[in-house]
Amino acid sequence: MRRRIGCVVLAGLLCAGMVSATAFAAVDWKQLQGAEIRFLMNKHPFTTYIEPKMSEFEKMTGIKVTLESFPEDQFRNKRLIELNARGKVDGYMIMPGQDELHYWKAGWLQPMDAYIADPALTEADWDLKDFFPSFTKASSVEGKQIGIVINAETSLLSYRKDLFTRLNVKVPETMKELEEVAKFFHGKEVDGKKMVGITLRGKGAAATSQWVDFLYSFGGSWTNAQGKSNFASAEDIAAFKFYGDLLRNYGPQGGAMLHWAESTSSFMEGKAAMIYDANVFKALYENPKESKVAGKVGYATIPAGPAGRLPHVSNWSLSINRNSAPERQKAAWLFIQWATNKNNCLGALLAGVPAGRASAWNSKEYKSKDDHQDWTANTMKSFQLGQPQWNPPVINVPEIRDITGQVIVDAIEGKDVAASAKKAAELMDKKMER
């Protein structure tokens, strides 16, 4: 009886205009027909995937979208110049861990929360909760959603599965076991090659994006509760020392000069038993035209330190310019919503772009084509464990990464790590005071 009365009352309210019919309707994708918006994009695999599909969005909405893409360094410079000059930019790609704090303080990031909550602008099945929480958090500032992930990354321990099987070596579960396995392989002659135990990035600032996983797993952090550098803490020093010792004792010669290209090349040449680096490098390791270890690689999450397994996550997101006109901001949101819907995220994943949506990874379409299930399982596990703060929580990220990188280099070279970390902490605090 109550249900019948409720229906009658609701019908009456609708007739009287007291309840908005749009509350029960799907999004009107033509509501901003005729709008023109401009996005600045990095020349990235996601851009390559979405560009050929633009006519689909424009036909559905009547919104004209101009995507301008540039190589990464040029893109970063152009984005900064145009936003600073208040150019006609409605949306853009951003790596939140690198730039969000700077761009937020500058007033260039429009919060998306109101758009997401508005049923007239966002389809119910778009579903923000389908994105891995670590990436949703990583693309937010002060509790405001300022980006939607289009490319999700973490790092994995990749290892020579064939050699581990042949020599009956267990995949390391802890940092202690990681060191033991690296020691076991280091200097061992296998198939006519003298192996190194592990290869890692060691070239200053470039190493920080991988070292940070060791930092968290050892219980350390970039800053303490007072917002000061935490580098002089016992946990941070332990992470610096372990990473440096591992590369110096069991890695290639000249470890302090290794960027990702040199490190991955060493692994692909079959010279290293293990490598810890970005999960996306699977595409390099498994390419038989470029890699001598294709088909011979296994994948695992970072071994547990005193604080557990705590890898970082990083991502590229799409954001809206806070200085764009309100109607163009809404049009930009419709584009971002469409570009990151479930179908497009699945399509991007099938095209080789790691998606931020769980539904894409769990889909039948992806699983039927997944020929590296250990990579998938450990990538998803790392997404779930992921720490979103992969860069220092400061505006001047490059400067602090340079300071951090010097401690890593000192650790690799066997210098006094505690003294180096203390000096870096003092310098970092001075830089953050500016």
Q: Predicted segments — roles?
A:
Residues 181-184, 225-257, 302:
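Glycine-centered hinge/linker elements that transmit conformational signals in sensory
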Residues 25-31, 97-154, 210, 294-300, ...:
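Hinge/lid segment of periplasmic solute-binding proteins
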Residues 158-161, 313-327, 350:
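A bilobed periplasmic-binding-protein/Venus flytrap-type ligand-binding module shared by bacterial periplasmic
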Residues 30-34, 113-131, 189-190, 196-202, ...:
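Short, solvent-exposed loop/beta-turn-alpha elements that line the ligand-binding surface or hinge
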Residues 137-150, 155, 179-229, 272:
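Extracytoplasmic/periplasmic solute-binding protein
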Residues 30-31, 36, 59, 64-65, ...:
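Conserved C-terminal helix/tail region of periplasmic/extracytoplasmic solute-binding proteins
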Residues 26, 129-130, 297-302, 350-406, ...:
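Long, aromatic- and glycine/proline-rich binding clefts that accommodate carbohydrate-like moieties
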